[in-house]
Amino acid sequence: MSDIGSRYHSDLLGCGFKELPPTNQFSGVGRLYSLPQEYGNGIYWVYSEKDLYDIKIHDFCFHQDSFFYFGIPQGCLGICYYESISGEEILPYRRLTAGCVKSFIGGTEPCKTLIHKNTPVRSVDIEITPSYYEHYLKAKFPNEYINPHEAFSNIALTNRFPEMIQLLRQIKNYKGNGIAAKLFFESKLTEAISLIMEYNKQQSSLPSIKLSKADLLALNNGTAYINDHFNCDLSVDQLCRITCMGRT
């Protein structure tokens, strides 16, 4: 995989972004870009280390509802915290709201996302490549290495990961420069992977809940009813009667 920073630079300029000079709002080791004015206003900050990983900060707002269809490179793994957003992932359908943490898995189906207008998109994300976790990590911990792919996959979308939220906020608020900044970002990347693996370990230890065939059938009936009556006022009591389930 080629240098990540060069790839982002080329892609962003090709989409109409303009590179800006460094400001005291962000660390000077990254590169800063402005969103094309015809789409909205705001900035996009990127820091990368060779072909190993990158860290990105988004802070912009669109003039119109905007639909995005993009793929993540094969093998890349990412995690993102949305401080502010209003939108939906189309397939699979998931609502994106402020305060959620989401993982990204490269090489799967391209992500289809609708971002609503006039709501700031403020997010911080970390992305690692196979060069990082299959070579760098594996060489560093040859006897303890665990492929992080499953751990990233199991996060999906959650608002119950306060440790990761705190870490990504620290990244956003950091404004250092030089080697101190590079060491800071590298340490935070390592910490993030540690948190993801620990989160996965804790989730795996929770007791699993198995649904009976009757419960699955009831849920499918409820889903079908909602799809057929999406433009109607539906009450919780009404859905409880349809699915033969209680409020809890």
Predicted regions and their residues:
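Short Lys/Arg-enriched alpha/beta "domain-start" segment
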Residues: 1-29, 35
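Short, functionally important structural connectors and interaction interfaces within domains
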Residues: 4, 45-47, 226
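N-terminal regulatory/effector-sensing and dimerization cores
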Residues: 28-145
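Alpha-helical bundle regulatory/interaction domains
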Residues: 90-211, 247
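N-terminal positioning helix adjacent to the helix-turn-helix/winged-helix DNA-binding module
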Residues: 163, 211-222
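Basic/polar phosphate-binding segments, predominantly the helix-turn-helix DNA-binding elements
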Residues: 192-202, 221, 225-248
